[in-house]
Structures are given as C-alpha cells and as structure tokens.
Regions:
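Short, charged, intrinsically disordered terminal tails
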Residues: 290-306
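Glycine/alanine-rich phosphate-binding loops at beta-alpha junctions
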Residues: 246
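A generic structural signal for short
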Residues: 243, 262-263
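Intrinsically disordered, low-complexity Ser/Thr- and acidic-rich flexible linkers and loops
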Residues: 229-237
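Short, hinge-like loop/turn segments at secondary-structure boundaries
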Residues: 231, 283-284, 304-305
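Acidic/glycine-rich phosphate/pyrophosphate-binding loops and surrounding catalytic core
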Residues: 2-227, 249-257, 263-266, 272, ...
Length: 306
C-alpha cells in the first residue's frame, strides 16, 4: 500500500488529543533537522536519483511495537509514492529476529526517512514495552504516565503509553487541575486550595476540567474526605485523590476511608518490583514517570535488501 494511504487511514490507537499540538508538524521538524539546508549528502552523492530499493525493519529485541502508524506518516512526508507493507501493527508483540515491515521505492527517499522512523519507533516501542510490563503487573489498577516526557514529544510519548496498554494522565497544565504540595503550601492549606480552585473553574466556565488533590499523610487524606462530605463546601470538580509516597498499608487504609467517593491514584516509589503489590491495595490508578523518563529504546534496525 502507498505510504500516503497508510498515513491517512485511522490509526489502531489514536494519539491523545491536544489543542495546539500537530503530529505532522513534529514529523516535519524531525525531518528538517536531519537534512538541514542541503539534504542527505551521503545518499545524494552515492546513489543515483532513479535507484529503487526494498528495505525491511528487523526487531533485534522482543517487545511491543509502537510507532507503526507514525512511521507511515514519516515515510509519506518524505515520499508519498513509497510502498509499505506492515506485518505487525501498533500494540502487537514483535520477536527478536522478526521482520515486521517492508518498504519499496526510491532508495534516497528510504534512507532519508530511515533515522527519523527508527528514532520515533525505537523510543515509542521502548515505552510501550515497559508500559505493557507495568500494566500487566498493576492489574486491576490502571497504569498512567506523567508529564515527565521529552520536551516537544509529549503527545508522542503518551501515545506510546496508550499503545502499551496504559492510560494517559493529564496531557499538560491545561486539562486537569493537580493541587500538589506546593499549591497547598502557597494557598494556606488543602481547604483553601480546593475552594479557590472550584471558584476559579466556575467563574471561567471550565466545568469539564477536573481536580486531583495530593495527600502525603493520612491526616491529609482525612482532610480531603471531610471536604468531600461537607455540604457547605463545593467539591463537585474533585474526582481523584493522589496518595503520594505512601506505604502499602497506608494506601489500603486510605482506599477504605475514601470508600469510592473519588478515584484514587498511587504515586511515588513505583517500580516493576512494587507495582503488583500497589495494584492490590484497591487504588484506581498507579502513575509512574519511569514509563517515559527512564525508558530504554527497543533495538530495531532498517536494512536495504541487496
């Protein structure tokens, strides 16, 4: 299938929405930074302009594929006439030694796209592979990432989390309120922060924006519960309580105290060794920055057939 047709089809996993972010713009920037103002001088100087080739993508490690659809967008941006065949799609498991894509067309075009395709795909597949491991261990809790992403690539990183079986936390500072320790300290306490936030959202017509409140101690958990139960305090936008760096026992106690009033989210000290036990506490979500800030790229190579 022509890359242009692949790129225009609906992806198996749509990227998270963002009001000012364009995947096409990110792809164009990645391609432009690679070729600069004179182009791919290696290919231009060694390969005749009309040379046609076939190349394949080879998995050199086992993991979860992510970046299949984005790679088609990259290839189409370089040369819409390239023909691509995908044997695996986003979210599929790929095995070490497996060829999972074939692209045919102008050799210069393939090589111009090569590094950008691999950079996106290796990082995304690394994130998806790690997310899959965490998500499987965390069940029945749902894994979330954080905003600890590569600047300029947040939607790409969060897209990979979706492909790996996780869910997205807030995309940025604009789509969810998180009242954390610094906000609480500056506002003069949890109650002041929540009331001020509810007032702000009401005055600006931001009824779709929800509030998450961080609690670091059981006393703070009880303070939030008291607010939720107080008929004189507006808390309709508060939908989640973050349990920050709490022990397993404290998380179990907090979940029991919350008793379904709002969702709960465990955060802090989340590793592949601890995430299963955290998931058994009854929390709704588990968030980990490691899914995007400590990931290892999945080893994938592109090879021209000879």
């Amino acid at each position: 299938m022509r890359c242009a047709d692949e790129a225009s089809r609906a992806p198996k996993f749509p990227p998270p929405p963002h009001p000012t972010y364009s995947i096409d713009t990110v792809v164009r920037a990645a391609l432009d930074e690679d070729v600069g103002d004179v182009g791919d001088v290696s290919s231009l100087s060694t390969i005749p302009a009309d040379t046609r080739s076939t190349a394949t993508l080879l998995a050199k490690a086992t993991g979860t594929l992510a970046g299949e659809h984005l790679s088609s967008v990259v290839l189409a941006a370089v040369d819409p006439a390239l023909e691509v065949e995908w044997m695996k799609r986003d979210g599929d498991r790929i095995e070490r030694g497996e060829i999972f894509m074939r692209v045919t067309g102008n050799a210069r075009s393939i090589l111009r796209a090569e590094r950008v395709v691999l950079n996106f795909m290796q990082r995304m597949s690394g994130i998806a592979t790690m997310t899959r491991a965490y998500a499987d261990a965390a069940a029945p809790a749902t894994m979330l990432e954080t905003r600890k992403t590569v600047p300029g690539l947040r939607v790409i990183d969060k897209w990979a989390v979706l492909i790996g079986g996780g869910k997205n936390h807030r995309i940025g500072l604009f789509d969810m309120v998180m009242i954390k320790d610094n906000h609480i300290a500056a506002a003069g306490g949890i109650s002041n922060a929540v009331e001020a936030c509810e007032k702000y959202l009401l005055e600006r017509g931001l009824s779709d924006v929800k509030i998450e409140v961080e609690a670091r101690t059981m006393d703070e958990v009880r303070t939030v519960i008291d607010l939720l139960d107080d008929p004189n305090v507006v808390t309709k936008s508060v939908t989640r309580l973050m349990l920050d760096n709490m022990s397993i026992d404290d998380m179990k106690t907090a979940v029991a105290l919350v008793a379904g009033r709002v969702d709960t989210e465990a955060s802090g000290n989340v590793t592949l060794d601890t995430v299963h036990d955290i998931g058994q506490t009854g929390v709704t979500y588990i968030s980990s920055g490691a899914l995007t800030h400590s990931v290892s790229a999945l080893d994938i190579s592109l090879n021209i057939d000879v």
